[in-house]
Amino acid sequence: MPLAQLAKAAGAAISRFNRVLEINALPSDEWDVVTEQGTVRAQHVVNAGGCFAPEVGAMVGVKVPLVNLEHQYLVTDSHPALASLARELPVVRDSRCAAYLRQEGQGLLIGPYENWGSKPWALKGMDWGFDRELFQGDLERLMPFLDRCMERMPIFSEVGVKTVINGPITHTPDDNVLVGPQAGLRNFWNLCGSSIGIAQGGIGKYLAQWMVHGQTELNMASLDSRRFGAWADRNYCITKGIESYEVMYTAMGANENRAQGRVRRTSPLFGMLADKGAVHGVVAGYEKPLWFRTNEITSEASTWERSAAHPAVALECAAVQNAAGVIDISGSA
């Protein structure tokens, strides 16, 4: 609301409970936004449709690469140990629990991101009648993770559950927000797919810079909505969206490439390089060779430090530096 008040003070008009029916492109590069209460002529349109972003995108003939999943959190009854604290507990994010745990008043708020058994929602499209309703809670689906939460924070096992909140949340294939120009359209922008909205509260500032100045003060490549092309079809988005949800709180190494949706795009050299022992990662959907197995080094573990493959990479660098080599960088084109 404070942002809305500031916008209105600066001259913006806000129309609520007014569904958009059509978005039509004009030869002037403007848009006619047809609503239930009339048509608005707009120089720019921003798709900030949240769960409805794919439906909004469909109005202008584009596919928005995100999927909705159910996410639950619960609030407990009060606990005397929390009531007696002089300061609030810090927020805990635990990979084994796959959950966040924090104090809520004199109780706890706990929200698992299930490592398995997550539940996608509205895969066949959103119902325009949906208006921020919540779903029935399903604690049985969370029990393996709640049991671990009780081990992590034993007072959780000593209180009852007061409230279970279950609602939809959007996830993109890589779990980064979709922001920036829509490929193939002029003056149409995306600002959607935010699965952790509180962490991206300032993203509107950078979209505004992009729209007004054509660039931003930050490198937005990892968030640019054009990073997904036609190759990221609906099945891919569903598979990767589910994976994004289920690895949300998994500790992943810097050298780790997610397993789902692989071998999506390949160069003509893919098969030959794989036969020669190439270990592939993913760049823009392309299988990109990272290093080659040797007789001594056949794999590397997930790590944030120098991996077991480092000596093999050193041999490859020396070969290219001292002789010659061909490097497949199709995914960087």
Briefly describe each language-model feature range.
Residues P2, R96, G105, K119, ...:
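C-terminal catalytic lobe of FAD-dependent flavoproteins
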Residues H44-V62:
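Flavin (primarily FAD) binding-site architecture
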Residues V62-A86, P144:
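Central beta-strand plus flanking loop segment that forms part of the substrate or channel wall
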Residues Y100-R102, L108-P112, N190, K288:
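Short hydrophobic-aromatic micro-motifs
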